Amino acid sequence: MSNARREFLLELENVKGSVGLEIGPLNKPLVKKEELESNGEIFYLDHLSTEELQEKYKDEASVKKDEIVSIDFVCRDGDLLKATSGHTFDYVVASHMIEHAPNLLLFLSEVHNILKPGGTCVLIIPDKRFTFDINRPVSTFGSVLENFLSKATYPSISAVYDHSAMAINANGHNLWYGIVNADDTRLLASENIGWEAAHRVHKEGHYYDVHVNIFMPE
């Protein structure tokens, strides 16, 4: 995240002097403990413990294992209130997280449960026009509602298939400046892979970590 964006976030709602929760900081937290004032506090939550995250990303070149932050709360089932032991916060922040949420409405409801009255939820969301999702349709409220009413706990068949069949090897910098190279349009997977993955979701409930919710500013 650019310094300008981090500075904007830190000034928002007096983050430096408030008690907050950051979801999914990994090795690049938006709010750093050392930047807070004496009355400010930040807690970190993820779906795995610090040690489990270090093991998961040990072979991932883009993630520096020794920089993964110390996780305060682990939430494996989506119940944020239970995971945080009933704590409430002045603000909750998450970057590039809700596009992965199998059940977006439930997640937002869970965030509401852990916010103090008048609290703030800050979400940093990718614009599909500048990501590998550029060819995918924007999510409708109908699809979001379906995931909520069906109590989805893993990415839907349609999300898994669409990712395989449409996601491209996009360079965000190129897309931002309107530059399109041949390699930027190459599919990350294929329709055949999408078909196989969709069947695995249907038969086994397999969890594929893909973008479920696709956004544009409008």
Walk through the language-model features, giving the residues of each.
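Generic detector of well-ordered alpha-helical segments enriched in charged/polar residues
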Residues: 6-10, 81, 145-146
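Residue-level detector of functional hotspots within protein domains
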Residues: 6, 28, 201
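Class I SAM-dependent methyltransferase Rossmann-like catalytic core
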Residues: 1-17
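Soluble or luminal CAZymes and related metallo-dependent hydrolases
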Residues: 1-4, 103, 215-216
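Conserved SAM-binding loop
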Residues: 18-134
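S-adenosyl-L-methionine-dependent methyltransferase catalytic module, highlighting the catalytic core
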Residues: 62-75, 106, 112-116, 120-218
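General secondary-structure edge motif
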Residues: 3, 91, 203-204
